[in-house]
Amino acid sequence: RLGPPSLRRAASNGPLGDAAADRALPVATDGDPSKETALDSDHWTFWGRGQRPPERGSKNAWASEPLHKIRTAEAFFRLHGALEKPSTLGNGATYQLFRNDVEPTWEDPSNANGGEWSIPLERSADLDDQWKRLCLAAIGGQLTPSADDADLDEVCGCSLSLKKGGALRLGVWTKHRTDEASQRAVAENIRRVLSLQKEVALTYAPHDSKGDALYTS
């Protein structure tokens, strides 16, 4: 299986490191793409970061790395089956799935004016299923605010982070933080696809806000 602590070795059949070279990443497919279910974008890129090493190092040395591109729903299922399950990962590990060549950084142009919906969850048996459902909703266009062409790329990606002490957070990154109607529509879609109870509070914070919530749902 792919995953921490050997995320780098797991994708050794394709280059890692500089995301600008993303086009050379291995495409996760064994079948005929023409006979499989196309995604709502040209491709999505799966990123990963292993458990934080005990020694202190530079922030960049512990950055997420691109692992694989996926172009069809079937390719997603194959890759998902090969990765370590979220429930087995150690503290500090992160999985991210982002649209096309968008990088999971605040500085990426697609993220610069955006923010993130944070979804608190318990580290429980259904974590693996919740992560899979969130990813499938993202790549299938089920999280977008509307069917309008202008909204199709509003959702930039989704993430899973395991924090110290067992805290867990799912996230959905969006493009336009000032469009409140769109952000609230995304939140409602998140609730629907994850079957979240009303008492689960979602918070939306701009990437540069140091965690201060702009919207809640």
Roles of regions detected by a PLM:
Residues 1-2, 119:
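Intrinsic structural disorder
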Residues 8-16, 25-36, 41-43, 52-62, ...:
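Conserved NAD+-utilizing ADP-ribose enzyme module
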Residues 48-50:
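Residue-level signal for short segments within beta-strands and strand-turn junctions
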Residues 64-69:
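A short, exposed loop/beta-hairpin motif centered on an aromatic-Gly-Thr core
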Residues 71-74, 126:
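A generic structural signal for alpha-helix starts
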Residues 74-86:
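Short active-site loop/helix that positions an aromatic residue
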